[in-house]
Design a protein with these regions (language model features):
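Collagen triple-helix signature
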Residues: 83-89, 103-109, 155, 175-178, ...
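Secretome/extracellular-domain signature
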Residues: 1-138
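Short, structured beta-strand segments at or near domain termini in extracellular proteins/domains
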Residues: 56, 67, 226-239
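Extracellular trypsin-like serine protease catalytic domains
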Residues: 137-187, 191-205, 211-215
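Extracellular (secreted or membrane-anchored) zinc-dependent metallopeptidases
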Residues: 205-210, 214-227, 235-237
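Conserved "cap/hinge" positions at secondary-structure junctions
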Residues: 17-19, 197, 236
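Short Gly/Pro-enriched turn/cap motifs at secondary-structure boundaries
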Residues: 46-49, 183-184, 222-224
Length: 239
C-alpha cells in the first residue's frame, strides 16, 4: 500500500512492521531435535499448521493512516491467501468447505472458531480488536490487536518446539498474525485492518488480512510484497 499524507511538526507515529509467520516444527514420532522443519523434511508430512503473517500499520493516537494486510499461513496442499488490497480479510482455503473460517470485515478479526473445531488455526487480528481465544492448547492462538501490542498468536502445543524443532515454532507473525495448530491442523490467518480467517480442521490454509488507506492517491496490490517480512517506508516529499 502507498499513499501521501500531510503530517505536522511533532506528530508522533506508531509504526508496526509485519513479520512472517513461523514454520511448522512438529515432527512425526516426537523426535527431539534442534533442526528446522525445512532441514528435517518431516513437518509437512505430519501436516502441522503454519503461522499467519502480521500486518503493517502506521497510526497515531487519533488517526489510522495506512495498513498493509499480512498473508495467511500455508498448509499441506494449499498456499495461504495473500494480504488483500481491499479492507476485508479473506476466508481460509482448503479441501473441505465445511471447515472454512471466515475473514473479518470492517476492521474486525476473523470469525471465532467453535468448540467442535479439530486443530483450528488462530484468526488474524483486526484494527478494532483481536479475535476469540483458542479452545485448547492443541489449536493455534489468535493474533493480538493494538491493545495487546500486535503480538502474534502462539502455535499449537506440539507445534511450538515441544515435539521436535526449535521454539517458538508456528507462531503468528508480529502484527496480529494467528498461530498454526499442531498435528493435522489448520494454519493461522493474517493480521491486518480486518483479520484473515483460520480453518477449523486439517489442511486449511489461512486467509489474508485486509488493508486500509486514509491518505491521498492511494494505491496497492493484493500480494504486492514479494519479501518474507513486511516493510514500512516513509519518504519526506517537502517541508
Amino acid at each position: 500500500m502507498e499513499s501521501t499524507f500531510v503530517l505536522f511538526n511533532q506528530t508522533v507515529l506508531s509504526i508496526v512492521v509485519g513479520q512472517r509467520g513461523g514454520d511448522s516444527v512438529e515432527v512425526r514420532g516426537g523426535q527431539a531435535t534442534s533442526q528446522t522443519a525445512a532441514e528435517l523434511g518431516l513437518s509437512v508430512e505430519d501436516n502441522a499448521g503454519t503461522g499467519g503473517g502480521g500486518g503493517s500499520f502506521a497510526y497515531n493516537t487519533t488517526n489510522l493512516f495506512i495498513v498493509a494486510g499480512g498473508g495467511g499461513g500455508a498448509s499441506a496442499g494449499n498456499n495461504g491467501v495473500d494480504g488483500q488490497e481491499g479492507p476485508n480479510g479473506t476466508d481460509s482455503v482448503g479441501p473441505n468447505p465445511t471447515y472454512v473460517g471466515k475473514g473479518g470485515t470492517g476492521g474486525y478479526p476473523g470469525e471465532c472458531n467453535t468448540a467442535d473445531a479439530l486443530y483450528h488455526g488462530g484468526v488474524g487480528a483486526g484494527w478494532e480488536r483481536e479475535g476469540c481465544n483458542r479452545v485448547g492448547i492443541q489449536h493455534g492462538e489468535r493474533g493480538d490487536s493494538r491493545a495487546q501490542e500486535w503480538v502474534g498468536g502462539r502455535a499449537g502445543d506440539m507445534n511450538s518446539g515441544n515435539n521436535g524443532g526449535p521454539p517458538p515454532g508456528a507462531v503468528g507473525g508480529y502484527g496480529g498474525g494467528g498461530g498454526g495448530a499442531e498435528d493435522n491442523g489448520a494454519s493461522g490467518g493474517g493480521g491486518g485492518y480486518s483479520g484473515g480467517g483460520s480453518g477449523r480442521r486439517m489442511q486449511q490454509a489461512g486467509g489474508g488480512g485486509g488493508s486500509y488507506c486514509g491518505g491521498m492517491g492511494c494505491s496497492g496490490t493484493t500480494g504486492g510484497n514479494p519479501e518474507d517480512q513486511g516493510r514500512v517506508q516513509i519518504i519526506r516529499l517537502f517541508d
